């Protein structure tokens, strides 16, 4: 999404090709917004559908629009990741499907998300609960709702009042994953907090990917204190407290 926002005018019109439809039809069970060959849709609408509901047909259409193919887009993603400091990330498939060579980690994903959240339009999209794609030449309007339950207003159990993004995802190998960001509650003084959850196992009773995210965010806002502006001895004292609280956090999550 960040590449599309940086490379394209959001109002540019993309015409969906036959090859995009063929690619998505070959991926059974993949999330999509059911694009059709010849459909004309804006870059912005494609980005919203990627971010809110993980629409892979939208990804395929954007990748082809920007650089001609998914393979070329994966190369572009790799170059972008390295350029912003994600040194331990290797991208081989633009759509995230498993290959033995493709990998990343929580630290690199945090670097990537921090960079993305400096883009105003990206922040707006990441924090969006509901979005309607206007009718196109091939389809009527489409109503989307964010699958990130920290944002989703239809889910009271996991909704986080100050959450402002970012992206949830799932594959059979990776399990449930979430990159999330939240502002401090009104009663707290602090900064925006970013958390990465990888490989969460969900059950019918509990979506642990969101439970863990809420646990991390609450713990951070309740225990974090900025050290800037304090004397060195105060900073050392606060650092010792931080080490202690991190240990407690590990106990909570284990």
Q: What name fits each language-model region?
A:
Residues 1-107, 116-120:
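Active-site-adjacent loops and short helices of periplasmic peptidoglycan-processing enzymes
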Residues 86-87, 98-103, 107-108, 113-254:
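Domain-terminus/edge residues, biased toward the C-terminal soluble/receptor-binding domains
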């Amino acid at each position: 999404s960040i590449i599309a926002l940086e490379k394209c005018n959001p109002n540019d019109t993309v015409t969906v090709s036959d090859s995009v439809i063929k690619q998505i039809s070959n991926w059974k069970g993949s999330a999509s917004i059911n694009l059709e060959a010849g459909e004309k849709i804006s870059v912005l609408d494609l980005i919203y559908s990627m971010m809110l509901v993980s629409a892979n047909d939208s990804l395929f259409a954007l990748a082809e629009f920007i650089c001609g193919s998914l393979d070329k887009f994966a190369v572009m993603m790799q170059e972008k990741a390295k350029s912003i400091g994600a040194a331990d990330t290797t991208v081989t498939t633009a759509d995230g499907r498993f290959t033995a060579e493709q990998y990343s980690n929580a630290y690199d994903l945090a670097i990537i998300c921090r960079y993305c959240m400096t883009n105003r339009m990206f922040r707006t999209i990441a924090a969006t609960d509901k979005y309607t794609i206007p009718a196109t030449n091939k389809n009527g309007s489409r109503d989307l709702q964010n699958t990130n339950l920290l944002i989703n207003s239809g889910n009271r159990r996991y909704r986080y009042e100050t959450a402002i993004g970012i992206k949830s995802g799932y594959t059979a190998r990776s399990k449930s994953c979430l990159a999330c960001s939240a502002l401090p509650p009104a009663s707290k003084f602090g900064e925006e907090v970013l958390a990465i959850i990888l490989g969460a196992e969900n059950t019918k009773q509990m979506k642990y990917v969101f439970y863990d995210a809420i646990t991390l965010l609450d713990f951070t806002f309740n225990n974090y204190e900025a050290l800037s502006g304090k004397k060195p001895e105060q900073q050392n004292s606060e650092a010792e407290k931080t080490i202690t609280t991190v240990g407690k956090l590990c106990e909570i999550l284990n």
